[in-house]
């Protein structure tokens, strides 16, 4: 199916180099991995309801490879391809992938397809893959870091076979709302991404050639005792890669106004929610 040629749509003025540099230090994002694991578990629950037997699976934005083993377990006959734009993430992903090496060799003798896990470094919007070569695209909390999601969807559609399946998750417009509101009390700079609404994603999917897209929303609230821990997790989730972000440190008075605004948002149980 041909992909319509539409002008690219910017989700936000995201600095791709900043994103890649941030995720090139896996230790910085490790404290936030609890959320990716929770979302991954919920995605796998949904995927279990779909009866498919893929031969090639792409984990787009695989990070340090936490989802590769589960995908390999779910589809032992498939070749699992992990792709990420950050070279350091590829190096981190080699550890879980190498644990499957012995099983890969065993399966390759029994199965006609190339079973196992392979790793690629590349952009979500410029896949180093042939057209119609993937049966399942999996992407967990990666899409929102790309400035042109419609371009990413077009690439995923190009790589997928006609009856292929796309399963992805990403942050929505209400994500980090508390942080945006608190910083708005301090200055006029953006301090968090304006994440895309799922209805806009649905339109993009249809425009790029996907049929019958089904999207839904789940709310996950993480609670904190202190504003400092909340802000530390926001940084660990990916920080602020906007080209319009403040350059340099915020003044002490402005920082205190932001903290005071956060404190006003405490819940009845005394916790801060995010």
What are these regions (language model features)?
Residues 125-136:
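A short acidic, Gly/Pro-enriched loop at the edge of an enzyme's catalytic core
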């Amino acid at each position: 199916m041909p992909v319509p040629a539409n002008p690219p749509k910017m989700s936000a003025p995201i600095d791709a180099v900043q994103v890649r540099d941030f995720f090139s230090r896996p230790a910085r994002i490790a404290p936030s991995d609890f959320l990716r694991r929770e979302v991954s578990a919920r995605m796998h629950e949904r995927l279990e309801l779909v009866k498919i037997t893929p031969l090639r699976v792409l984990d787009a934005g695989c990070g340090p490879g936490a989802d590769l083993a589960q995908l390999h377990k779910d589809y032992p006959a498939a070749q699992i391809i992990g792709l990420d734009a950050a070279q350091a993430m590829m190096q981190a992903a080699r550890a879980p992938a190498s644990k499957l090496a012995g099983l890969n060799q065993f399966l390759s003798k029994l199965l006609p397809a190339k079973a196992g896990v392979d790793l690629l470094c590349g952009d979500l919007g410029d896949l180093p893959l042939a057209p119609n070569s993937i049966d399942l695209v999996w992407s967990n909390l990666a899409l929102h870091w790309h400035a042109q999601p419609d371009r990413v969807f077009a690439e995923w559609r190009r790589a997928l076979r006609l009856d292929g399946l796309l399963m992805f998750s990403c942050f929505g417009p209400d994500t980090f709302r508390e942080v945006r509101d608190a910083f708005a009390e301090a200055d006029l700079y953006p301090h968090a991404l304006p994440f895309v609404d799922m209805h806009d994603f649905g339109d993009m999917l249809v425009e790029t050639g996907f049929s019958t897209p089904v999207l839904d929303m789940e709310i996950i609230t993480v609670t904190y005792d202190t504003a400092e821990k909340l802000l530390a997790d926001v940084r660990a989730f990916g920080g602020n890669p906007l080209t319009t972000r403040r350059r340099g440190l915020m003044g002490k008075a402005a920082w205190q106004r932001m903290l005071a605004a956060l404190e006003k948002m405490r819940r009845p149980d005394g916790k801060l929610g995010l």
